[in-house]
Design a protein with these regions (language model features):
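PLD/PLD-like phosphodiesterase catalytic module centered on the HKD motif
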Residues: 1-128
Length: 128
């Protein structure tokens, strides 16, 4: 299995925009792995939003994966067969499913919910 950060590193090296929203700062293992891909420090945009619980990957606004898996070893199936999580997800190019995901992601990214957010105390850098 190819590490997820290695996949992202390859994507940004091809000049493709990558934006990632975290609910909280990643743990030490993820940070150690992230340090192995210095291109990601400047080429990938990241933001924190403590209210984000959705897990989705959107490609060019026309294809999306959404599901239950966190971007962790257990969530992505990297753990042993007896330890990995049971997950599910959908990969689609149906505009009726993709467009609302794009709208939700972009709304959070732009800070549309920041001003009235009840969790601002947990947000390190509110967008608005």
């Amino acid at each position: 299995m190819v590490p997820f950060l290695e996949v992202l590193d390859g994507i940004v090296k091809r000049g493709i925009e990558v934006r990632l929203i975290h609910a909280k700062d990643p743990g030490p293992n993820w940070c150690d792995d992230f340090d192995r891909y210095p291109t990601l420090w400047t080429a990938m945009e990241r933001m924190l939003c403590p209210r984000v619980h959705f897990k989705c990957i959107i490609v060019d606004g026309v294809r999306a994966y959404f599901g239950s898996a966190n971007l962790t070893g257990a969530g992505m199936g990297a753990k042993s067969e007896k330890k990995r999580n049971f997950e599910n997800g959908v990969l689609t190019d149906d505009p009726a499913l993709v467009e609302p995901l794009v709208e939700q992601f972009d709304s959070v990214w732009r800070g549309a919910f920041c001003r009235d957010c009840g969790r601002r105390d947990f947000c390190g850098d509110p967008v608005a």
